[in-house]
């Protein structure tokens, strides 16, 4: 693992982000899979991280990064997605020096593999990795070092959560992940999910702790709900999962 991805105590991280300009944040949307991609950058060092890029919008993301004068260090996936092909492969070719990152528990290839407690540094900032399995075994949530925002992937959505009926998902595991790894964050911590299907963009920990119709249930009730969703499988799953297992180390097929 490269030295830029290291285990760092939360207190030290908070001190790093307490001075200077706030983190640069851009939320971008891909309409076919209703996926949010997040660009975070340090306004001083110009180092940046991109979370959950999508193949169809990778050139858009690269153009924005260039326009803002940023250097993309990492293209990060919160998990091995089933509804779209990751844009990490294209971004690595468009932006030399960018490395792909994913949880080691995903089983996917990447330049760097991370796990619980690892931190991804960019300038004065860092993202803490919190394992949040359940939607898939390799799901992670990324928490900015001052705990002002969390990027929850498919583990926690706005008034919802990721499904648990494929990719070795487990409703009980997801319930405990959200309650133990996300709902323990400060109430005003902003929640940025990987998807939204209703035009919503951001929530907070307190909102989801009190208003999320699934995750305010008991664990037993939650499992019953998740086991009876009867959703169709994602349209791209047979193409997306094999491509995403390469996680951008090899350019995905177009």
Swiss-Prot record:
Location of the transit peptide in the chain: 1-7
Record-listed N6-succinyllysine modification sites: 32, 172
Originating organism: Mus musculus
Cofactor: Fe(2+)
Gene Ontology, cellular component aspect: mitochondrial matrix; mitochondrion; nucleoplasm
Designated name of the protein: Persulfide dioxygenase ETHE1, mitochondrial
Keywords: Acetylation, Cytoplasm, Dioxygenase, Iron, Metal-binding, Mitochondrion, Nucleus, Oxidoreductase, Phosphoprotein, Transit peptide
Family of the protein in this entry: Belongs to the metallo-beta-lactamase superfamily. Glyoxalase II family.
UniProt GO MF annotations: identical protein binding; iron ion binding; sulfur dioxygenase activity
CDD domains registered for this protein in UniProt: POD-like_MBL-fold
Effects seen without this gene: Mice are born at slightly less than the expected Mendelian rate. Pups display growth arrest at about 15 days after birth and die five to six weeks after birth. Mice exhibit elevated levels of hydrogen sulfide (H(2)S) in liver, muscle and brain, together with increased urinary levels of ethylmalonic acid and thiosulfate. Their mitochondria show decreased cytochrome c oxidase activity, probably due to the toxic effects of supraphysiological levels of hydrogen sulfide.
Domain of life: Eukaryota
Catalytic activity field: S-sulfanylglutathione + O2 + H2O = sulfite + glutathione + 2 H(+)
Signal peptide limits: none
């Amino acid at each position: 693992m490269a030295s830029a991805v290291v285990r760092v105590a939360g207190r030290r991280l908070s001190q790093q982000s307490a001075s200077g300009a706030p983190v640069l944040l851009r939320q971008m949307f891909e309409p076919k899979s209703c996926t949010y991609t997040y660009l975070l950058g340090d306004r001083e060092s110009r180092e940046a991280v991109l979370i959950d890029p999508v193949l169809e919008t990778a050139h858009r993301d690269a153009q924005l990064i260039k326009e803002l004068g940023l250097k993309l260090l990492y293209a990060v996936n919160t998990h091995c997605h089933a509804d779209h092909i990751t844009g990490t492969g294209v971004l690595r070719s468009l932006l030399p020096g960018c490395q792909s990152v994913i949880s080691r528990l995903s089983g996917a290839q990447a330049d760097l593999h991370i796990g619980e407690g690892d931190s991804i540094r960019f300038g004065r900032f860092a993202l803490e990795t919190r394992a949040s399995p359940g939607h898939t075994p390799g799901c992670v949530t990324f928490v900015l070092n001052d705990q002002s925002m969390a990027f929850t992937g498919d583990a926690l959505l706005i008034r919802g959560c990721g499904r648990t009926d494929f990719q070795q998902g487990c409703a009980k595991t997801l319930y405990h992940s959200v309650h133990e790894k996300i709902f323990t964050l400060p109430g005003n911590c902003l929640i940025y999910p990987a998807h939204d299907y209703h035009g919503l963009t951001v929530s907070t920990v307190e909102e989801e702790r009190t208003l999320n119709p699934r995750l305010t249930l008991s664990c037993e009730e939650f499992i019953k709900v998740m086991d009876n969703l009867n959703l169709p499988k994602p349209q791209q799953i047979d193409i997306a999962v094999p491509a995403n297992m390469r996680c951008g180390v090899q350019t995905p097929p177009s």
